[in-house]
A protein has these predicted regions:
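Rossmann-like NAD(P)(H) cofactor-binding subdomain of soluble oxidoreductases
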Residues: 95-146
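Conserved short alpha-helix immediately C-terminal to the canonical SAM/SAH-binding motif I
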Residues: 53-54, 88, 113-116
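Short glycine-/small-residue-rich Rossmann-like dinucleotide-binding loops
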Residues: 84-86, 110-111, 136, 211
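Rossmann-like NAD(P)-binding element
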Residues: 70-107
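NAD(P)+-binding Rossmann beta1-loop-alpha1 motif at the extreme N-terminus of oxidoreductases
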Residues: 2-75
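Short secondary-structure boundary/capping segments
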Residues: 12, 71-72, 98, 123, ...
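Interdomain hinge/lid region at the active-site interface
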Residues: 221-290
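Internal alpha-helical scaffold of NAD(P)-dependent oxidoreductase catalytic cores
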Residues: 152-237
Length: 300
């Protein structure tokens, strides 16, 4: 964990979030708690998770003050962040529902939004207005509480996909929490979010993982890996992420993923034909377009 020491700069009015509950105290949830502590905008932090040892470690690291059940978190927290694999959100919300305080706001950090919104509606019913869907565009291949970084969200973008049932106050509370972490916050439609993220986040991870699996299972895998250099390292870095989390993301965003796979397969087929035919003009044009686009990309 980096820079997770608590700050005391809360101001006369006290912290923005008196009691925060984080469900899933790993890279995303742990960094959220650490960033709010660093900003002096959280009072007490409750941690919820499946692994008692991991929660105990989160307490040792100062990410959370105590480990509690999902039900207890729902009853006590002013804001709940769900940072678990998206496939498990419906179950967590169903457990929380009978215990949710009327003023409690719930948000998530899931990488897909349309299916998460559907799950929230099914789980929460008429209380769905307390759930403000969100997605921080930040992450790393590291996992667990040790991966938490108070600066993870500084300068990053967080996308909210508010529901018609959300109150302005609930949306603003989530927005201000992410801003306190150093992030810029924008709003998007859930479907548009999923289509864009399938292209620039989900598909790259799948391609990295598929390539890594192909190399790792080859008959001469040991030789290949021994000779691999920086290009291999850079391309496969994200394949080291949580398999459970990414499985859920791919399946949750199935339609958009299939559309993106069809598009990238068409380009791959074009490149394969150019190589097979010795078509240097087509191959050079493809590589030049890619190189120029990457060089002109505004972020690093």
């Amino acid at each position: 964990m980096n820079d997770a020491l608590p700050s005391t700069d809360q101001g006369a009015a006290g912290p923005l979030i008196p009691v925060l509950a984080v469900v899933g105290v790993g890279l995303i949830g742990g960094s959220f708690a650490a960033a709010l502590r660093r900003a002096g905008q959280v009072g007490r932090v409750l941690g919820v998770g499946r692994n008692a040892a991991s929660l105990a470690r989160a307490v040792e690291l100062g990410l959370i003050d105590e480990a509690v059940s999902a039900e207890d978190a729902a009853a006590r927290a002013d804001l709940v962040l769900l940072s678990t694999p998206v496939g498990g959100l419906k179950n967590v919300l169903s457990r929380m529902l009978p215990h949710l305080d009327a003023a409690t706001v719930v948000t998530d950090a899931g990488s897909t939004k349309a299916e998460v919104v559907d799950a929230a509606r099914e789980a929460l019913g008429e209380r769905v207005g307390c759930f403000v869907p969100g997605h921080p565009i930040a992450g790393a291949e590291r996992t667990g509480p040790e991966a938490a970084d108070a600066k993870l969200y500084a300068g990053r973008t967080v996308i909210l996909t508010p529901l018609a049932e959300n109150s302005a106050a609930s949306i603003n509370q989530v927005r201000r929490a992410w801003q306190a972490c150093g992030a810029s916050v924008i709003d998007m439609d859930a479907g548009a979010h999923d289509r864009v993220l399938a292209s620039v986040s989900h598909l790259p991870h799948l391609l990295s993982s598929v390539y890594m699996e192909q190399v790792a299972t080859a008959a001469d895998a040991r030789t290949r890996l021994d000779l691999a250099g920086s290009g291999f390292r850079d391309f496969t870095r994200i394949a080291a992420g949580s398999p459970e989390m990414w499985r859920d993301i791919f399946l949750s965003n199935r339609d958009a993923m299939l559309a993106e796979l069809a598009d990238v397969r068409a380009v791959l087929d074009r490149a394969e034909r150019a190589i097979a035919d010795g078509d240097d003009v087509t191959l050079l044009a493809l590589l030049d377009t890619a190189a120029q686009a990457r060089r002109n990309w505004r972020k690093e």
